[in-house]
Amino acid sequence: MDRIIIEGGNTQLKGEVVIEGAKNAVLPLLAAAILPTEGQTLLKNVPILSDVFTMNNVVRGLNVAVDFDEERNQILVDATGDILDVAPYEYVSQMRASIVVLGPILARNGHAKVSMPGGCTIGSRPIDLHLKGLEAMGAKIQQTGGDITATADRLKGANIYMDFPSVGATQNLMMAATLADGTTIIENAAREPEIVDLANLLNKMGARVIGAGTETLTIIGVDKMHGTDHSVVQDRIEAGTFMVAAAMTNGNVLVKNAVWEHNRPLISKLREMGVQVTEEERGIRVISDVTKLRPVTVKTMPHPGFPTDMQAQFTALMAVVKGESTMIETVFENRFQHLEEMRRMGLTSEILRDTAMIHGGEQLQGAQVMSTDLRASAALILTGMVADGKTTVGKLNHLDRGYYQFHEKLTKLGATISRVNGE
């Protein structure tokens, strides 16, 4: 398996970096492309990531034509023929987000069978909210041997209150409701930008989704949907990762195409820490002097709170800021695994249930470390840039799921990073 080697200690990032389309947006968009029975769906600004290839294969396995033009970052989907109702286990088992095909398949075919999904090992991440919502819409759910089978002649509009604003459940139920008989209201819905992006695509397809980005979603069912063109929203987590990278390396970086509104919680905490963050016509500029930064307390929350997908990267920033910072993780359990690896680099930290205390400001040392999940892999690479000596990061399969040419982009900004093949 590939490794990334970082020569750290004096890294100072300067220049411009271009942000890709959002991984967390394009995966449900591909699931939504199952719904139209007329016309083709063209997705633009698609990131070239292993998760995208996996989702393409999930959709192809349903007898849907999927053509990925990597040079143009476009995917053309044609689901106008009869589609299968069993999602391919070979690919579903690789990725958590693949569960979002359950709602679209069920809505279109009246029957769906999907295996329990795989992906990052971050907590239990139960899918009960998905299933409860579908049951409220009239689906009969069976779980046997790791498979989920859902049946409904036609889903019925329903009032659904979600116990937690789950992004995946909101996406699944929103897509299922587009072809339901009647009106569905989802309360305590997720409000992430990726939810808004999905709603925009569905509405272009002929759906009637109202209230995306608020706590209450209203979906008025339609009889059929059609293909359309849609450009994937920019990746706020990739943007945030490079903003943090600039902050922890005394950098001056323009993060091109980054959307200010989508990154507001992160920007607020960076400014509280003392980082200079400004909005420019082409993106967001980050300028930092680490010696002047202050420790902060951060609590992850569903959007519009601080994103859990930026938690690991922000703890890397906390590690270089003198004093004690606190990170409280409220969204997922078991998401501090990267701190164990960072301790190998000299970080002093304590973890008590959902809270990590980071004692920052001590010079870190390069070490051999292993990625534990997608965002942890980015955090370890960022930490390697500020640690003295050589850091080797393994298990890059996690990194490739969510970042395109990550080490190349950092190299162009001034980091000394290489990727090598083999064990």
UniProtKB/Swiss-Prot annotation:
Annotated positions binding phosphoenolpyruvate: K23, N24
Entry-linked InterPro entries: Enolpyruvate_Tfrase_dom, Enolpyruvate_Tfrase_sf, MurA_subfamily, RNA3'P_cycl/enolpyr_Trfase_a/b, UDP_GlcNAc_COvinyl_MurA
Catalysis performed (reactions): phosphoenolpyruvate + UDP-N-acetyl-alpha-D-glucosamine = UDP-N-acetyl-3-O-(1-carboxyvinyl)-alpha-D-glucosamine + phosphate
Catalytic site positions: C120 (proton donor)
Enzyme Commission designation: 2.5.1.7
Modified sites of kind 2-(S-cysteinyl)pyruvic acid O-phosphothioketal: C120
Major localisation: cytoplasm
Keyword Transferase carried by entry: yes
Any GO molecular function: UDP-N-acetylglucosamine 1-carboxyvinyltransferase activity
BP terms from Gene Ontology: cell division; cell wall organization; peptidoglycan biosynthetic process; regulation of cell shape; UDP-N-acetylgalactosamine biosynthetic process
Keywords: Cell cycle, Cell division, Cell shape, Cell wall biogenesis/degradation, Cytoplasm, Peptidoglycan synthesis, Pyruvate, Transferase
Alphabetical list of HAMAP family matching this protein: MurA
Family statement drawn from the similarity comment of this UniProt entry: Belongs to the EPSP synthase family. MurA subfamily.
Role noted for this protein: Cell wall formation. Adds enolpyruvyl to UDP-N-acetylglucosamine.
Protein name in UniProt: UDP-N-acetylglucosamine 1-carboxyvinyltransferase 1
Source species: Streptococcus mutans serotype c (strain ATCC 700610 / UA159)
